[in-house]
Amino acid sequence: MFLIVGLGNPGEKYLNNRHNVGFQCVAEFARRHHLSFDGKRSDARIAEGLVNGQRVALARPQTFMNDSGKSVVGLVNWYKIDPASELLVVYDDLDLPFGTIKLRNQGSSGGQRGMNSIIQLLGTQKFARLRFGIGRPPEGWEVINFVLGNWNAAERETLPKLYDRAVEACELCLSDGVTKAMNAVNGEAPKKSKDQAKEPANEQPR
């Protein structure tokens, strides 16, 4: 079993937030492979199935972002998997420009609170993660308002291609292993278009 966890917050109000890009990526993976999130386990919505002959579980923790580790540890124990080789976590990363997707086989949380929780409760940093760049907030914005804000129009136009790249990265992890997948995924970050540079980040949530 290979477990792919997308991080986010449950509930309609958070559905299209930047912070929920992990949820959005695993939802696209499920759609592409005709899997349904009709299971529930360890405070997570679960979709299971075969992808290219390999058993896969997709998870969207329902614990809220900052407590993601509680759900992930429960799932790791339930499926009896080795995090170092059978776990991939997908999440938003402020330190990567929007449009950048990076795959790593281990490392720190980079300050992302969901990852903080997972690392703390798993007791290890040795598991794969797919970092989906959302960029830094515009001047004058609080970080919390930016990550809990919805994508702006220019970002929404680009997202389908980025979701495709994220799903393809997950598929490469399954077919080739994380180390080989890293070589294919970690190319140069795409340049920001003029439209994206000018587009406002949307009004801050109140």
Curated annotation (Swiss-Prot):
<comment type="similarity">
    <text>Belongs to the PTH family.</text>
</comment>
<dbReference type="GO" id="GO:0005737">
    <property type="term" value="C:cytoplasm"/>
</dbReference>
<keyword id="KW-0694">RNA-binding</keyword>
<feature type="region of interest" description="Disordered">
    <location>
        <begin position="185"/>
        <end position="206"/>
    </location>
</feature>
<feature type="binding site">
    <location>
        <position position="66"/>
    </location>
    <ligand>
        <name>tRNA</name>
    </ligand>
</feature>
<feature type="binding site">
    <location>
        <position position="14"/>
    </location>
    <ligand>
        <name>tRNA</name>
    </ligand>
</feature>
<keyword id="KW-0963">Cytoplasm</keyword>
<keyword id="KW-0820">tRNA-binding</keyword>
<dbReference type="GO" id="GO:0006515">
    <property type="term" value="P:protein quality control for misfolded or incompletely synthesized proteins"/>
</dbReference>
<comment type="function">
    <text>Catalyzes the release of premature peptidyl moieties from peptidyl-tRNA molecules trapped in stalled 50S ribosomal subunits, and thus maintains levels of free tRNAs and 50S ribosomes.</text>
</comment>
<feature type="site" description="Stabilizes the basic form of H active site to accept a proton">
    <location>
        <position position="92"/>
    </location>
</feature>
<comment type="subunit">
    <text>Monomer.</text>
</comment>
<protein>
    <recommendedName>
        <fullName>Peptidyl-tRNA hydrolase</fullName>
        <ecNumber>3.1.1.29</ecNumber>
    </recommendedName>
</protein>
<dbReference type="GO" id="GO:0000049">
    <property type="term" value="F:tRNA binding"/>
</dbReference>
<feature type="site" description="Discriminates between blocked and unblocked aminoacyl-tRNA">
    <location>
        <position position="9"/>
    </location>
</feature>
<dbReference type="InterPro" id="IPR001328">
    <property type="entry name" value="Pept_tRNA_hydro"/>
</dbReference>
<dbReference type="GO" id="GO:0072344">
    <property type="term" value="P:rescue of stalled ribosome"/>
</dbReference>
<keyword id="KW-0378">Hydrolase</keyword>
<dbReference type="InterPro" id="IPR036416">
    <property type="entry name" value="Pept_tRNA_hydro_sf"/>
</dbReference>
<feature type="active site" description="Proton acceptor">
    <location>
        <position position="19"/>
    </location>
</feature>
<comment type="function">
    <text>Hydrolyzes ribosome-free peptidyl-tRNAs (with 1 or more amino acids incorporated), which drop off the ribosome during protein synthesis, or as a result of ribosome stalling.</text>
</comment>
<feature type="compositionally biased region" description="Basic and acidic residues">
    <location>
        <begin position="189"/>
        <end position="206"/>
    </location>
</feature>
<feature type="binding site">
    <location>
        <position position="64"/>
    </location>
    <ligand>
        <name>tRNA</name>
    </ligand>
</feature>
<dbReference type="Pfam" id="PF01195">
    <property type="entry name" value="Pept_tRNA_hydro"/>
</dbReference>
<dbReference type="GO" id="GO:0004045">
    <property type="term" value="F:peptidyl-tRNA hydrolase activity"/>
</dbReference>
